[in-house]
Amino acid sequence: MDMAKNDDKKQLKCSFCGKKQDQVKRLVAGPGVYICDECIELCSEIITDELEEDINTDMSSLPKPSEIKSYLDDYVIGQDDAKKALSVAVYNHYKRINLNNVNDDVELQKSNILLLGPTGSGKTLLAQTMAKFLNVPFAIADATTLTEAGYVGEDVENILLKLIQNADYDIEKAERGIIYIDEIDKIARKSENPSITRDVSGEGVQQSLLKILEGTIASVPPQGGRKHPHQEFIQLNTTNILFICGGAFDGVDKLIERRTRNSSLGFGADIKSKRDENVGELLKKIMPEDLLKFGLIPEFIGRLPITVTLSALDRDALVEILTEPKNALVKQYKKLFEMDNVHLEFKEEALKAIAEEAIRRSTGARGLRSIIEEIMKDIMFEIPSDESISKVIINEETVSNKNPELIEAEGGKRPPIKIKKPRAKKGNETA
């Protein structure tokens, strides 16, 4: 009897449920504690349930594609197809991040985005506005400044440093950010066939970008510049960073046209002149083989599976850009003049003339501000000193001769500017 009692005392048992070793399949030992396989399974189920609850909460707070597009509509004029495609791609990207945080049989692959469109069509603005809406860190990099490691220029890791800096060095936040790489078409290799000489700013940069686009733990020098062995590095996982690469890809339309023309020869083929199909329409037909012929390497094309094309902006779209968005240029200049107690008016004909000048210069929306600055420079210089001006009218002639119509104030002097002084807080007042 005493022997049986001693055996019971010696037998190990689970510290959580109290079951003895012979009552369970396995007992795992720790420093002074034991846990059985049944308790391990129960703990695993609890953790999984809590993770799924967190994911459901994250999914409910994730804006839907229609909400993303609606926000983009407030700031970016036109490009409806591009905004829809971008909204869906970004929504799916953040869904993927949330899903991959739980144990699941299906692993969603990363989907970076390639934006193609003429200069000034809104590529950078779309990416900036998207990041602002999602409230995630955002960084812009210029592909033309990048070179292969070991050569004069920027390493690709410097792109990641910009994102870390914009996230105030919060690594976890940076790892869910968005990076926009502009002028990506400028790192196309110089010829379709691999060159004997080293292409350090073309194919070499594409090779350097492959790992961070796919997802890797990158070593980022905290002070930027070149890496050296005696400095500490910031470790950044790029798996959940969304990369959007943009470029004008001048000349790729000719490659698309040649391919589509060759594939539609023969009886019954549609005969179209160049005038019938603009560059924007041709870009919508782009295929990986066109990008390959342009100079992107196959591995790089594979890391950018989603292609979004933007069309060149016509005159009406440019006029809308001048007036419609929340931060429209016309609204900005009116506000500047209002701060001097001067009313600024743009005639419809003037807006059309400004838009036509931007088209003539082939600068798109990007060139609108410089055109307006040229028109307004002299009058903005005079207004603070000349108190007789109460209203400035910009008409069609002003766009060419830079002489706006000026309206004098009643009595020859406009009212003084009223500046509201901030009221002192009661807590700051002294007796």
Curated annotation (Swiss-Prot):
Zn(2+) binds at residues 14, 17, 36, 39. Keywords: ATP-binding, Chaperone, Metal-binding, Nucleotide-binding, Zinc. Residues 415-425 have a biased composition (Basic residues). Residues 405-431 are annotated as: Disordered. Residues 2-55 form the ClpX-type ZB domain. ATP binds at residues 118-125. SUPFAM superfamilies: Glucocorticoid receptor-like (DNA-binding domain), P-loop containing nucleoside triphosphate hydrolases. Gene3D superfamilies: 1.10.8.60, ClpX chaperone, C4-type zinc finger domain, P-loop containing nucleotide triphosphate hydrolases. Pfam families: AAA_2, ClpB_D2-small, zf-C4_ClpX. ATP-dependent specificity component of the Clp protease. It directs the protease to specific substrates. Can perform chaperone functions in the absence of ClpP. This is ATP-dependent Clp protease ATP-binding subunit ClpX. It comes from Clostridium tetani (strain Massachusetts / E88). The lineage of its organism: Bacteria, Bacillati, Bacillota, Clostridia, Eubacteriales.
